[in-house]
């Protein structure tokens, strides 16, 4: 499973996930060159890489995903983080992502959308 954490997530979460699973391919959109990408371009890039987006953007990202799907395009997969998980609660987010990765890390995530439970 390859993950991209969006700019709304603590970049330290990527390090925590890598410590938990040394072979997990995790990037943060805060890395140089990535933060400037528009959401549609980010989804296109992630589709090409087969990388799943983990995002807190529940306002505009669902519409971008829908637009891609309606155009017959795929995406790498999206995991939405609900607002009920506080932005400062990295520990809870790490726990929820850990549960999901353990349960479904080997699944095909192409064009799949998932909401983490709080």
Regions found by a protein language model. Name each.
Residues 39, 45-66:
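Acidic, metal-binding active-site segment of PIN/NYN-like and related structure-specific nucleases
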Residues 2-7, 11, 15-23, 30, ...:
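Acidic, PIN/NYN-like endoribonuclease modules and their adjacent C-terminal/linker elements
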């Amino acid at each position: 499973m390859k993950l991209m954490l969006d700019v709304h997530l603590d970049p330290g979460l990527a390090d925590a996930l890598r410590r938990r699973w040394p072979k997990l391919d995790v990037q943060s959109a805060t890395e140089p060159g990535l933060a400037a990408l528009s959401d549609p371009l980010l989804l296109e890039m992630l589709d090409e890489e087969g990388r799943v987006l983990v995002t807190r953007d529940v306002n505009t990202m669902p519409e971008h995903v829908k637009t891609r799907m309606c155009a017959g395009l795929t995406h790498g997969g999206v995991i939405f983080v609900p607002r009920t998980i506080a932005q400062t609660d990295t520990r809870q987010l790490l726990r929820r992502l850990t549960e999901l990765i353990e349960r479904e890390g080997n699944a095909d995530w192409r064009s799949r959308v998932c909401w983490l439970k709080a």
